[in-house]
Amino acid sequence: MESNSGEIEELPPPPPLPPNAEPIKTDDTKKLSKPKRALMARSGCGKKGQPIQLLTNHFKVSLKAADEFFHHYYVNLKYEDDRPVDGKGIGRKVLDKLQQTYASELANKDFAYDGEKSLFTIGALPQVNNEFTVVLEDFNTGKSSANGGSPGNDSPGNDRKRVRRPYQTKTFKVELNFAAKIPMSAIAQALRGQESENTQEAIRVIDIILRQHSAKQGCLLVRQSFFHNNPSNFVDLGGGVMGCRGFHSSFRATQSGLSLNIDVSTTMIVKPGPVVDFLLANQKVDHPNKIDWAKAKRALKNLRIKTSPANTEYKIVGLSERNCYEQMFTLKQRNGDGEPEGVEVSVYEYFVKNRGIELRYSGDFPCINVGKPKRPTYFPIELCSLVPLQRYTKALSTLQRSSLVEKSRQKPEERMSVLSDVLKRSNYDSEPMLNSCGISIARGFTQVAGRVLQAPKLKAGNGEDLFARNGRWNFNNKRLIKASSIEKWAVVNFSARCNIRDLVRDIIKCGGMKGIKVEDPFDVIEEDPSMRRAPAARRVDGMIDKMQKKLPGQPKFLLCVLAERKNSDIYGPWKRKCLAEFGIITQCVAPTRVNDQYITNVLLKINAKLGGLNSLLQIETSPSIPLVSKVPTIILGMDVSHGSPGQSDIPSIAAVVSSREWPLVSKYRASVRSQSPKLEMIDGLFKPQGAQEDDGLIRELLVDFYTSTGKRKPDQVIIFRDGVSESQFTQVLNIELDQIIEACKFLDENWSPKFTLIVAQKNHHTKFFVPGSQNNVPPGTVVDNAVCHPRNNDFYMCAHAGMIGTTRPTHYHILHDEIGFSADDLQELVHSLSYVYQRSTTAISVVAPICYAHLAAAQVSQFIKFDEMSETSSSHGGHTSAGSAPVPELPRLHNKVRSSMFFC
C-alpha cells in the first residue's frame, strides 16, 4: 500500500486471535469459494410514465479531507486478571477513559469505536505503545452486598463498610492492534456516484461515528437506529410494553453521491417504573396476589433495575425460591467480643430492622435476585424499578401490534417535519470525527425525478373492463372473469354470536350477482356448547366427527365460522385437518359487520381457492406482455418466514409459489417446507433422493407448470425473492439460483431456460414526498435515479395508494437478467404484477407472487404448534442441517388441494 509520500508502506501482520474469539458462523452449509456470477450493472433508466418531481429523506453529504486514511485497530479488552470483558456497554466506558487518560500518548486523536472489537482513527496512532491500563473509579460491580442488598451465604462480611462504599475501582487492560488502512478517497468516489472496493468499509466507519455520537447522548442503539429517553417519544401498547419512537440514520452511496438517509424508526421497550407495576400490566391482573411468579421470572430475566434508596443499577438473574418473609441468608457481623459470626436472618427482617426501610407489601412475594448462581443477592420487589430504554424482544400480541401500527402512523407532511427536526437536533456538525473528515451534511431534502406509470387495464367477466382509479377498483354490477361453483359444501360454526342463516343467504345472493353458482349447503354443523372450553385440537376433532356423521359424503368446500378473526387458536388445527388430512378447501370467517363489501371480499378468496379467477390483466388476455407472453415463462415468488422475536428455536418456513397455465400470470400454486431456525437462505430448493427423485421445492412447481401449460416447459424463469439484505445478494445469486438450475437439469439435462432474478425489499428507510402536498405519492410512482445504487440495477416503486401514514416504496434489485428486459418493460411488468392479487380490489405494495409466498408460509406454519412438533417430529419425519438438531417437517398438503390457491 502506498503512503501519502508515494512510498510503499509495509503493513504489520494481522493481530493474533484472542483466546475467547469465536469464528463467524455462516448460515449456509455451502461455501462460496469464488462467486460465479456478479450483480448486474444498470443498463439504462426507464422513460415511460408521467414525470413528477419528488423529495426524498436523503440529505447530501460533502467531503473535504479525501486524502486522509481511516486507521482500523482491533480492540482486545480484558480485566486485570486477563479475563475477557464480555459485558455490553463496558467497552465504551473503558475506551472513553482511555482517551482521557492517555490523550497525549495517543496524539490527542479522536476515536470512532463500535462498542465491540473495532476502533478507528483518522491517521495512525503513535507506535509508542499498544497496551494500556485503564482504571474506572466509579465502576458498578453489580454486587448488591456492596450497595445494601442482602448478600447470599457465601458473601464476605463487614456489610456496614460496604454500604458506605457503593462503588469501587476496576482495572482493565486494553490492547490496540493495527488491522487496516481505509482510504477516505473511497468516500470521494462515492460522492462522484462511483464505488470502489473500499467504499462500503469507509461508509461503515462514518456510520460508526454516527452511532458513537448518539451513544454519547445516552441513546439506546439498535443497529443504525437511535432512541432517546424522552417520554414524548413513548406510546403505551399495553401489557407493560411501550413503543419508542426514534430515528434511523445511515450513509448511503447513491447515483448522485453520498447521502445521509434519515427516517423515523420504532422499537419496543419495557415500560419503566416499579417492577410490580410492570408485572401487573404484563399479566393483565389487578393485584400482586394474582401474579403468576413462574411467568414473572421469565419476563424479568436479564432486565435491568435500579434499587432504592441507593439508586444503583443491577441486572435481574431470577427470583428467590421463598417469599421475602421466609427467604433466609447469613448476615456476617461482629459479636460482643468483636469476633465475626454469622446470623441467619430473613431478607424482610434485614431491610426493615438493619436498614430501617419500611416495606409495605413485599413480605408475601419473592425477592428479586441480582447475584450470581452460587451467591444470590436479594432485594424486596417494592424497592426495584425497571430502568428506561430496555428493549422488549418478545412477540407482540395481535392487539399490541394493531395499537403500534395505529399510534406510529405519520402523514407525509408530519414525517417531513419530524425528520427536519431530527437532523437539526442531532447536531452532527459538532461531532469532532466528522469535522476531522471534512464531512458536512446538507439540511434540505434531496430532489429526485420520478415517473407515474399508467395503471394496467383489467378485465372482468363477460369481457367487461375494470378501471383502476388511484390503485382501486370494484366489482359493482360486474361478474368475475372465471367464476367457480360452490357445491357440495357445508358450514361449521365455532361461534355462538353469528347468524348463520343470514350469512348463507347473503353469500348465495352475492355469489349469483358475481357469476358464482352457490348451491344450498348440505348442512350447518354447530359446535356443542360444552366443547367451547376444550383445547383447540379437541374442538376441531369433535367438529370433524360431528360433520362426518351428519354429511352424506366428504364436502368439496367448508365455510368455517370463528368467534375471533385473529386470536383464534382454532385456525391452525382446522386448516391442518382440512388441507393436509382431508384435502378440503376451506374459508375461515369471523364476521362482525356483514355487508355487501364484506361478502364480496369473502367470495373473491373462495373463488380463487376453488380454481376461479376474479380479474385478469388485459395484456394477459391478449396476450401481449413484453418478453413474457410470446415465450413460455414461469414466475416464482420466494420467501422465508421466521419465528416471532424471542423464539430462536422455532423452525423457519420457506415457501415458493409459481405461476401456472401460461400465458396467465395471475394464477399460482405453492410449495412449502420447514428449515433451520433463522436461516434466511432457502436450503430445500433442490434435494435429490438418489438418481431418480428430487424432493426439493422447485421440482413439483416445474412439473405443475408443464402439466397446466399443455406440456410445455418454461423457456424463461422470472424469480422474485423477498426478505434478503444486500449482504446476501451474492448468496441468492450463486447458491439459490444454482439450486434452481440444478432442479431444471435434474428433470431434463438438455433444458437450459433463461433466468431473471429480482430481489424485493420493504425493510429499508427511503421515503418519497410530493413537495407542498399533504398527500402521498400517487400509485405507480417509480424512481430509478439519484438515490438508487451508483452501479447496480435497482429502482423504487410505489405501486399502491398509501391511504394511511406515509407510503413505503418497494426497493427492487435486478441481480441477474438473461431474458433481456429493458428498464421500461421490467418496471411495467412489476407494476402489473401488483394488480393481479386475487384477494383484493386494490393494487398492492409488492408483486403478488411475493405476497402469495408470504401467505403460504404463514398459513402452513400454523398447521401445528412447533412446541408440539419437537415432541412428535419422529412421526412427521425430519431433516438435519449440518451441525444442528433435526428440523421437524411440516405436514404435506393433500393431493386434492396441492395445486390450488389455498393461501388466498
UniProtKB/Swiss-Prot annotation:
Spans annotated as Disordered: 1-33, 143-166, 871-890
Alphabetical keyword list: RNA-mediated gene silencing
Gene Ontology cellular-component annotations: cytoplasm; nucleus
Spans through the membrane: none
Gene3D superfamilies, alphabetized: 3.40.50.2300, paz domain, Ribonuclease H-like superfamily/Ribonuclease H
UniProt-listed GO biological process terms: regulatory ncRNA-mediated gene silencing
Protein name (Swiss-Prot/TrEMBL): Protein argonaute 4A
Record gene name: AGO4A
